[in-house]
Amino acid sequence: MSPQTETKASVGFKAGVKDYKLTYYTPDYETKDTDILAAFRVSPQPGVPPEEAGAAVA
């Protein structure tokens, strides 16, 4: 029989979802000549922040 080991949930990976605006959303980003831009019209459902709805497109 193999020895038992203890696994700590806080080590390595922590499950959960972070707000998009905390990780990738950069409102003051300035475009470069090499950027490719696309436009999407997004209408968030009631209670959903606009940047979170936009993250669904990204």
From Swiss-Prot:
Protein's cellular compartments: Plastid, Chloroplast
Gene3D superfamilies assigned to the protein according to its UniProt record, in alphabetical order: RuBisCO large subunit, N-terminal domain (3.30.70.150)
Catalysed reaction equations from the record: 2 (2R)-3-phosphoglycerate + 2 H(+) = D-ribulose 1,5-bisphosphate + CO2 + H2O; D-ribulose 1,5-bisphosphate + O2 = 2-phosphoglycolate + (2R)-3-phosphoglycerate + 2 H(+)
Role, per record: RuBisCO catalyzes two reactions: the carboxylation of D-ribulose 1,5-bisphosphate, the primary event in carbon dioxide fixation, as well as the oxidative fragmentation of the pentose substrate in the photorespiration process. Both reactions occur simultaneously and in competition at the same active site.
One Pfam match: RuBisCO_large_N
Something else known: The basic functional RuBisCO is composed of a large chain homodimer in a 'head-to-tail' conformation. In form I RuBisCO this homodimer is arranged in a barrel-like tetramer with the small subunits forming a tetrameric 'cap' on each end of the 'barrel'.
Name of the featured protein: Ribulose bisphosphate carboxylase large chain
EC code: 4.1.1.39
GO MF: monooxygenase activity; ribulose-bisphosphate carboxylase activity
Cited SUPFAM superfamilies: RuBisCO, large subunit, small (N-terminal) domain
Organism whose genome encodes this protein: Weinmannia silvicola
Gene Ontology terms: cellular component: chloroplast
Residue stretch(es) of the prosequence: 1-2
Sections of the chain in a coiled coil: none
Subunit structure: Heterohexadecamer of 8 large chains and 8 small chains.
Keywords: Acetylation, Calvin cycle, Carbon dioxide fixation, Chloroplast, Lyase, Methylation, Monooxygenase, Oxidoreductase, Photorespiration, Photosynthesis, Plastid
Keyword Chloroplast applies: yes
InterPro entries per the UniProt record, alphabetical: RuBisCO, RuBisCO_lsu_fd_N, RuBisCO_lsu_N_sf
